[in-house]
């Protein structure tokens, strides 16, 4: 009931993927060679013990209670990588009970003891970054270099919160009366339900689990059904690092049942979710009856604003990075490229030339910079957006159609003369399409950029410090990059405003999301 509709779309999309893959397996010999490479990677991961297919409950690897499974596919080839346990209500309730029981002992460890466990987990993640990167490429599709980069990025949150665990400070308040002493304590909120997406199968987990465990909370993770294998591998390394049974549980499979169990259980005191705004709203409503704390990192509609005075090379490089990372499948991707009149044509030409050089292919192939989209439903969405724009007067400079590789590959695309009556200027594309929108003045740029319900990330390219200051103050976004397209880091807060979410992840502020504040008043303190 709670996340059922979205989950069924995701699961249905997976089934569509299998059937479409079957019909598309008459691809080139190049794709068949890719298939062989993926198979060898899968075999290596299995022999290393990192290719787990069971859920983790109470420190034990378990099949689903009814022995049902779901298939995990390689989006580049359509091949089945593994059959993983398809868990539901009963398994999730047991995972919650396990986390609830483990909370007492885990939260009573000293911060230093929890820190050491997290540090060992970080060390293991880094030691296995090649295998984890291969696993990400296998089930999510992004290029191997980018996937290994995600492992380093994801691990950085575990390292950071291993250190931050020892810096959860309370406060002493000057008393209002002479016989009182006033204290403020910070204590872990309790059991956390973490629901994570497919586009960053490792980093979206560590960004939530790191601060949760560091603060003394215990966690039940529900990874995406499309990419559960990375989550399970990370959990295996967490066990090896000494995370005790029950402190970290992983259940996957029947998304509606798992979501409902997490949201309705009074033992779960917090929900943290990364995903679409539509699903986030449903989670908020479902969390209300038990008044859970909720953190939401939701959809974006990021503008990349290129002013006339921008350095053209810097603007092209930064916008390229902001738009085409993970084939455009990130919530902070530049969804709209706003370009001022005086530089519009020059930017369009230079940017298109840069996009033309992107290499599309299987993530395991050397030189690939753009992998497949996650499934056929994602490709169909991109096609719909492009067709809508063209029908309303936009012009395709390059790309604009499925790639000759077939499957779920889509050509990196640049479209000019995009206007605000087109779907792609209003909704998240989540694909490798860059719409170029013309503007005249600074005021126009700010108005266009803010004309959206979203407010996650924005980017500015200008050589004027004064202009950058005026614009980033006026932009209604949680993150702003100035002359830079890749801005997320473990040491800075990540999160949106408006309908892009609640709360922050990363940095010292991310720790506060997993802590309760307790005020203590000591009276009769003048008695001898």
UniProtKB/Swiss-Prot annotation:
Q: Tell me the organism.
A: Arabidopsis thaliana (Mouse-ear cress)
What processes does the entry annotate via GO biological process terms? Answer: adaxial/abaxial axis specification; cotyledon development; gamma-aminobutyrate shunt; gamma-aminobutyric acid catabolic process; leaf development; maintenance of shoot apical meristem identity; reactive oxygen species metabolic process; response to cold
Per the record, where is site Transition state stabilizer?
A: 199
The way its activity is modulated is described as:
Competitive inhibition by NADH. Inhibited by ATP, ADP and AMP. Redox-regulated. Inhibited under oxydizing conditions.
The pathway that the record names for this protein is: Amino-acid degradation; 4-aminobutanoate degradation
Q: What is this protein called?
A: Succinate-semialdehyde dehydrogenase, mitochondrial
For this protein's source organism, the top of the classification is: Eukaryota, Viridiplantae, Streptophyta, Embryophyta, Tracheophyta
Family membership, please give it: Belongs to the aldehyde dehydrogenase family.
Q: In which tissues is it expressed?
A: Expressed in developing leaf tissues.
The catalytic site is made up of: 297, 331
Q: Which Gene3D superfamilies match?
A: Aldehyde Dehydrogenase, Chain A, domain 1, Aldehyde Dehydrogenase, Chain A, domain 2
How does it associate, per the subunit comment? Homotetramer.
What is this protein's function? Oxidizes specifically succinate semialdehyde. Involved in plant response to environmental stress by preventing the accumulation of reactive oxygen species, probably by regulating proline, gamma-hydroxybutyrate (GHB) and gamma-aminobutyrate (GABA) levels. Required for the maintenance of the shoot apical meristem (SAM) structure and subsequent adaxial-abaxial axis-dependent development of cotyledons and leaves.
Gene this chain is encoded by:
ALDH5F1
Quote the record's binding site residues for substrate.
207, 325, 488
The disruption phenotype is: Plants are sensitive to UVB and heat stress, and accumulate elevated levels of H(2)O(2). High light-dependent increased of proline, gamma-hydroxybutyrate (GHB) and gamma-aminobutyrate (GABA) levels. Treatment with gamma-vinyl-gamma-aminobutyrate, a specific gamma-aminobutyrate (GABA)-transaminase inhibitor, prevents the accumulation of reactive oxygen intermediates (ROI) and GHB in ssadh mutants, inhibits cell death, and improves growth. The ssadh mutant defects associated with stress responses are suppressed by POP2 disruption.
Q: Which reaction does it catalyse?
A: succinate semialdehyde + NAD(+) + H2O = succinate + NADH + 2 H(+)
Enzyme kind, highest EC tier: oxidoreductase
What molecular function does GO assign, one term? succinate-semialdehyde dehydrogenase (NAD+) activity
**Which cysteine residues pair off into disulfide bonds?**
331-333
Which residues make up the transit peptide?
1-34
């Amino acid at each position: 009931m709670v996340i059922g509709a979205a989950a069924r779309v995701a699961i249905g999309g997976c089934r569509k993927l299998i059937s479409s893959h079957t019909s598309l397996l008459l691809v080139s010999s190049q794709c068949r060679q890719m298939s062989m490479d993926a198979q060898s990677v899968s075999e290596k991961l299995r022999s290393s013990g990192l290719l787990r297919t069971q859920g983790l409950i109470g420190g034990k690897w378990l099949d689903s209670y009814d022995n049902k499974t779901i298939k995990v596919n390689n989006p580049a080839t359509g091949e089945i990588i593994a059959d993983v346990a398809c868990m539901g209500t009963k398994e999730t309730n047991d995972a919650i009970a396990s986390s609830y029981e483990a909370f007492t002992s885990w939260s009573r460890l000293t911060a230093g003891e929890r820190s050491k466990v997290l540090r060992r987990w970080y060390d293991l993640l880094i030691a296995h970054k090649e295998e984890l990167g291969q696993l990400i490429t296998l089930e999510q599709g992004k290029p191997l270099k980018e996937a290994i980069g995600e492992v380093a990025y994801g691990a950085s949150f575990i390292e950071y919160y291993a250190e931050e665990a020892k810096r959860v400070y309370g406060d002493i308040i000057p008393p209002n009366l002479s016989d009182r002493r006033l204290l403020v304590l910070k204590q872990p909120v309790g059991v956390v339900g973490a629901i994570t997406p497919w586009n960053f199968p490792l980093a979206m987990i560590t960004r939530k689990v790191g601060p949760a465990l560091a603060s003394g909370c215990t966690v039940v993770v529900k990874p995406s059904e499309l990419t559960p294998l990375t989550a399970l591998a990370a959990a295996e390394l967490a066990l090896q690092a000494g995370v005790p049974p029950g402190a970290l549980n992983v259940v996957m499979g029947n998304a509606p049942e798992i979501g409902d169990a997490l949201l309705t259980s009074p033992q779960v005191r917090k929900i943290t979710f990364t995903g679409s705004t539509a699903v986030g709203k449903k989670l908020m409503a479902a969390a209300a009856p038990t008044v859970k704390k909720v953190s939401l990192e939701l959809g974006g509609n990021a503008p990349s604003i290129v002013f006339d005075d921008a350095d053209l090379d810097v603007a092209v490089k930064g916008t390229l990075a902001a738009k085409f990372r993970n084939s455009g499948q990130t919530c902070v991707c530049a969804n709209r490229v706003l370009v001022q009149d005086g530089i519009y044509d020059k930017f369009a030409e230079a940017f298109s030339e840069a996009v033309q050089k992107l290499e599309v292919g299987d993530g395991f192939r050397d030189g690939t910079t753009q992998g497949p989209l996650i499934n056929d439903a994602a490709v169909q969405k991109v096609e719909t957006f492009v067709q809508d724009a063209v029908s309303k007067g936009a012009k395709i400079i390059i790309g604009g159609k499925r790639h000759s590789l077939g499957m779920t590959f889509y050509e990196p695309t640049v479209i000019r003369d995009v206007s605000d009556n087109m779907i792609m200027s209003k909704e998240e594309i989540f694909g490798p399409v860059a719409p170029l929108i013309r503007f005249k003045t600074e005021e126009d740029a700010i108005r266009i950029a803010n004309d959206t319900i979203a407010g996650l990330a924005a980017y500015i390219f200008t050589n004027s410090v004064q202009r950058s200051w005026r614009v980033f103050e006026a932009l209604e976004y949680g993150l702003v990059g100035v002359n830079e397209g890749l801005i997320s880091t473990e040491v800075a807060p990540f999160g949106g405003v408006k309908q892009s979410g609640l709360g922050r992840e990363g940095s010292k502020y991310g720790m506060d999301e997993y802590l309760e504040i307790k005020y203590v008043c000591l009276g009769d303190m003048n008695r001898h």
